[in-house]
Amino acid sequence: MAVEKINASSSLAEVVDRILDKGVVVDAWVRVSLVGIELLAVEARVVVAGVDTYLKYAEAVGLTASAQAA
């Protein structure tokens, strides 16, 4: 069985379109401590999505006003 390598290259526009269509969530949590004393804590959640994608997600989890009224 031969291994076939496919060079599928995507343009930047295609990558951005896919990210906005599907959405990306980055959830980060960092804690820096020294000798048991917490010096710095950072918690971040970054969501990158198109408006349509966000509204579908928000309605599904009950974040929109129309979902809360129902």
Curated annotation (Swiss-Prot):
Disulfide bond residue pairs: none
Gene name linked to the record: gvpA
Family statement drawn from the similarity comment of this UniProt entry: Belongs to the gas vesicle GvpA family.
GO molecular function terms noted in the UniProt entry: structural molecule activity
Lineage: Bacteria, Pseudomonadati, Pseudomonadota, Alphaproteobacteria, Hyphomicrobiales
Keywords, alphabetical: Gas vesicle
Annotated protein name in UniProt: Gas vesicle protein A
One GO cellular component term: vesicle membrane
Pfam families per record: Gas_vesicle (PF00741)
Compartments in which it is found: Gas vesicle shell
Main location: other
Other noteworthy facts: During exponential growth cells contain about 75 gas vesicles measuring 250 x 100 nm. Gas vesicles are cylindrical with conic ends. They collapse by centrifugation (12000 x g for 10 minutes at 4 degrees Celsius); upon resuspension small biconical gas vesicles start to form within 5 minutes. They grow until they are 100 x 100 nm when they start to elongate.
Assembly description: The gas vesicle shell is 2 nm thick and consists of a single layer of this protein. It forms helical ribs nearly perpendicular to the long axis of the vesicle.
Physiological role: Gas vesicles are hollow, gas filled proteinaceous nanostructures found in some microorganisms. During planktonic growth they allow positioning of the organism at a favorable depth for light or nutrient acquisition. GvpA forms the protein shell.
